[in-house]
């Protein structure tokens, strides 16, 4: 029979743990043995006095003169609870601890200064902190696996961090309508530490925290006086506790984490808060880090871009006069390992309704939230509303603008699923089993899905979809293999970006995390100069430029706005025709006879006519139409197919020179770009419904008949080029395999150059 622990013993243990007495006594004895002071009792009294604040000593009439002994803490292997599953427990073992316990940073901090968090807050996902800017250098081999897993990076492949490389411009208009009325709080923040000072958890003993506070106050107040920062009111925690408590409550300050990370030494001295006159900007001094600058958004005015740029301006101004602690690989160093890099964090408070009517197949709200990989989740009930308070930090593996968009998308998707799910839409996070295929497009889609599924399966677009919603039509055979997969809107490209990156790496060797697609990068290529009699051997040429208009879901979704798209395109035509009529529009409903004739004669295609089951709107041919360019009989436009507009050249047995038409195609694309804001992203270029066209949005199909050369000869000649050959019963078809990273003009020039060389070899 198991012996029961006496109640008195339980209470005694509880008392010792509450005041950390065993640890204090062991560290005091360690310090005494280290110094071997000839007056041990006096030494111990002074040691204990050093643990109290000056105010506490006065309160209890303790007059104990300085100097106080220097602490020599006992370095102990951290205690891990049975339920603890953090990264510290995963990567720390007793063998490695033998070496680590002997190491100190240049500020005198040891391994226990980083690991106390795991004992006080075993649920923390990481379990350790950085106590100063020298931690990574001193404990490199120990910390790197933890940083790599927390940030989903490989330090061996990590480029040097670009300090102060803030970008003010980014596009974040996704999903905000879904959040109206439900998003009660949204806060952006930057955290920084001053160089050559230990961080707040071990600054108190040598009064460094006071130096940091004095320095930061002087710099902030100078900037306010110069008008470089907004007018702000200052509060001192030791004098304005109630006011500061209200501010901390307003921003959902995580006091539990701060206490567990041992950041309340000498509390409340040398803690200050600045708040702007409009209450939207808050600056914290000496809380979790030396400096934290926050932007609070008004739930009725979610101007994300303006607020973000305002915050960037403040942190840039402070960077001019303050040197922050950085690492050449890991960027800005913060106490919280999740925050290193940009030091950027988002916190939000969103109301979710109907969570009991789960739209998630085989799962529940808690499982889903845990899968979302938020750093923190707190659930509060206020009246009839349940508030989900989540926060996340921008990891080293992600660019800040993409991180913000992803976070906003996730919130919008959650709101769509639970608050605005009028269709009763369900969503599944179970892996779909796809069969291997000989079709390279389909196989690349399959492989990209399988390799990134676990990473992105809980990622939601602003319309509440996940990657399975896009893969399911492929799985059921609703979408032809040559289209691969059809996305619904640009938010899906951001939410499923790991899948998109993987697919582009497989299909084109293009890494969107490293390279960018820049539209209009024409180099020095001249289409006209490539003309030649060899091109007369070409039987047909089809060139397509796919474009979608910003602010609308793609036509490949059922909730698109085809009527608005058609109206915008008609307005653009009126503007382009204002000087001279060069474009005629034929509606498939109002001008059916003429439109059908143009489609038949020029072999134009409407994919959407055959893709109703694949998620395409079923109202075909409503709001569809054809553009005819009057001076260029081989150039057309198709409205509201799988993209909002498709510019195309369709030349059968061309008798005329091709270059003028190719030049005009690019010109007309740019002309429409003046009046229509196309969906464009500098990483992936023009956002087309199918990722196989990303970048230029271009598809080229050129057919020719040869006398001598066989298909295998042509295929070999196109190796290491941007093109591939396909064997067709009527001839050889050359198709561009490259769509991203090069300009439209470059690809067209390279096409004609390669075709000329092939035909020369055939003559």
Model-predicted regions and their roles:
Residues 56, 63-340, 344-345, 356-701, ...:
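Long, Pro/Ser/Thr-rich low-complexity/intrinsically disordered regulatory tracts in eukaryotic proteins
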Residues 26-27, 41-48, 344-350, 698-704:
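Short hydrophobic alpha-helical segments that form membrane-spanning helices or hydrophobic packing faces
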